[in-house]
Design a protein with these regions (language model features):
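The feature captures the conserved acid-bearing segment of alpha/beta-hydrolase catalytic domains
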Residues: 1-59
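Alpha/beta-hydrolase-fold serine-hydrolase catalytic core, especially in secreted/extracellular enzymes
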Residues: 53-55, 61-172
Length: 172
């Protein structure tokens, strides 16, 4: 779940490498609507796995044992991030380039933790399982040694993942 909104379609046209975004709808640090949801329309050759209720900290490998009994671990994440940010994150993105390079800072996009995290988030163990299956299936669908392996992995990513996990959806 990364900040996509500062990079325009022009930025992504420099490469035709397949792209998979995996974002959670309850991510308080990186707003889903302005970062995850825009991936398929903004990036050519991109797909999106959405985890309903997925939090930002739920993507961490340590999330399941540590945050298992929390309602939404992003409440801790926001406190930690906001305590070390001085004036925001714009300077980081400016270093990637200018508008002509496809980097555009939109002042209307919510900043990190601008919206309080919802009380409930997906279970971090399930979120981790979805993440690991999606990443493996994506890599196998692109780099699998044979067409049957690539095809089976693509089906796992596009169809089976959502069938196995009700909180997961795939968008091409």
């Amino acid at each position: 779940a990364g900040p996509i909104n500062v990079f325009t379609s022009r930025f992504y046209k420099t490469s035709d490498v397949p792209f998979l975004g995996i974002n959670g709808t309850a991510d308080a640090l990186i707003d889903y609507d302005t970062n995850g949801l825009i991936i398929p329309e903004r990036i050519t050759n991109a797909s999106l796995v959405t985890i309903a209720g997925g939090s930002h900290l739920g993507f961490l490998a340590i999330a399941d044992p540590i945050f298992r009994f929390m309602h939404n671990p992003d409440s801790i994440g926001c406190q930690a991030v906001l305590s070390v940010l001085e004036d925001g994150t714009d300077d980081v993105f400016v270093s990637f380039g200018s508008e002509s390079d496809g980097v555009l800072l939109d002042p209307n996009v919510p900043t990190i933790c601008a919206t309080l995290p919802p009380r409930e988030a997906a279970h971090p163990g399930r979120q981790t399982m979805i993440l690991e299956i999606a990443v493996l299936a994506f890599f196998e669908s692109v780099f699998g040694e044979t067409e049957p392996i690539r095809s089976a992995a693509k089906e796992q990513l596009e169809i089976s993942l959502a069938a196995d996990f009700e909180e997961a959806t795939f968008t091409d």
